[in-house]
Amino acid sequence: MLGNLLFDASSLIYALKLRNLKLLYDNYTQWLAVYEVINALWKEASLIGSISFQEALKLVKIFTEVVEFMKVLSPHPYESDILTMANKLKVSVYDASYVVLAREKGLLLVTEDDRLRIKAKSLVKTISLNDIL
């Protein structure tokens, strides 16, 4: 299973919070996830207050180091497929991009988003981080 996992932002954030980063190495994410993770950490620190800003900075630093050891995919040239998938599944374009990349690259989609996991399961194999810990 290792080496064929595509982590979405929700699973990346969960792995960061658990400090369980080993599974990320030599696996996949996409460059949009980098912004999604940073945005989620900013939101938790600045708007929700569930973590301090210093903790958010620390997690971003760790995440930046981990990404260096991941294979980072691009949604290009799949833009039309992504829009079509978003329309078909009634999910955001961001979520659809993970489904399309998992399908095109033959990867297992790792997501903590139950709704996405259910909607995508007929198209790609989906799992939660908890399924592989």
Residue locations for each model-derived region?
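Metal-dependent nucleic-acid phosphoesterase active-site entry motif
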Residues: 1-19, 29
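Acidic, PIN/NYN-like endoribonuclease modules and their adjacent C-terminal/linker elements
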Residues: 2-4, 29-30, 99-133
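Non-catalytic, well-ordered alpha-helical scaffold segments
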Residues: 10, 35-38, 57, 80, ...
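Phosphate- and divalent-cation-binding pockets in alpha/beta enzyme and binding domains
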Residues: 14-15, 36, 81, 118-119
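PIN/NYN-family metal-dependent endoribonuclease catalytic core
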Residues: 16-50, 54-58, 71-73
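Amphipathic alpha-helical segments within well-ordered protein domains
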Residues: 38-42, 64, 83-86, 99
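Membrane-interacting alpha-helical segments
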Residues: 51-64, 115-121
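Active-site neighborhoods of divalent-metal-dependent phosphate/nucleic-acid chemistry enzymes
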Residues: 69-108, 112-115
